Amino acid sequence: MDMGDHIKAIETYFQAIKVRPSHPDAYKNMGFVFKLVRFTEPNSNLKEIISSILDQKTIIKPIDISRAAISLLKFDPDIKKLLEKSLACEINESFESIVSDLSRNPLLLKLMSICAIPDPQLEVAFRDIRYSLIKSVNKIKSYPDLLHFQSALALHCFTNEYVYYQNDKETSLIKLLENVIEDTLSKGEQPKPFLVLCLASFKALYPYKWSDLLEITPAINDVVTRQIIEPKQENQLKSDLATLQKITNQISSKVRDQYEDNPYPRWINTGLSLKPTSFSEINKNLKLRLIDKRIFENKTPNILIAGCGTGQQSIYVASIFKNAKILAVDL
């Protein structure tokens, strides 16, 4: 199937969605096609469709359609301007107006909030904006559009494990910012949301001893949920997970600690099957050549996922197989 066929398929599914907006199969199939497509011209309707797919949370992995979304977003005049200024090293001169423009791009902010964005140009631009923000903490006046963008940026950096390069100047500024927030909270006062979001774009908030003292306001609600509440819930859930045996091997312990500190891939939403099916139905769809047919007699399969990582595969498999018991194992 060439690119023209992909575009025709998308147009067909788009028409189906217009007739029946709640058509899950059309969204699912369109999501599969988006994985294969890079757009060469703007299309505002498709931006809305991608946004709708992301809103449904379980249609497809956000990262799988992020490249298609980015190829559409790059036709947006504000994003074109962002990339031009980033290339010319001019973001610092006008970053406030750039941020205001970007804050009004719902698809961009949605992508930033739920997945890594695999695009080197945008990565450099986001890194430059982040640096400009922390350099301006004592000068900038916060406003709703700025906080909206900052929240998306902090969520994005948390999801990508703070992979962006951090220079020595930023490290010093982060230390100052940490002290300001801690001192403010120690006085029984609340730090400005701008400062909290600025720090959250460089470091996760949950390890800080003062994290529980933050009042959850609309401006920082999403970031506090993702960076404080959910990690603490995860730690509580650890005690409920069954352990086969205690790990004594030093290397295995180090690998486990590494993945627990920086779970990869960190994910927010994932794609699931629309409905579970039996082995025989799956075999029919995949056209597998199985010699031993006895597997089709098993109506309640026990399935082992060895090396389940951060759980996406285990959850997906559980959504595929009808009446299955899943045992997911890892360090």
Spell out what each predicted region is:
Residues 307-311:
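Class I SAM-dependent methyltransferase "Motif I" SAM/SAH-binding loop
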Residues 304-306, 324:
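Helical anchoring/docking segments at protein termini
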Residues 1-303, 313-320:
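Alpha-helical solenoid repeat scaffolds of the TPR/TPR-like class and their adjacent stem/linker regions
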Residues 325-330:
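Conserved SAM-binding motif I beta-strand of class I
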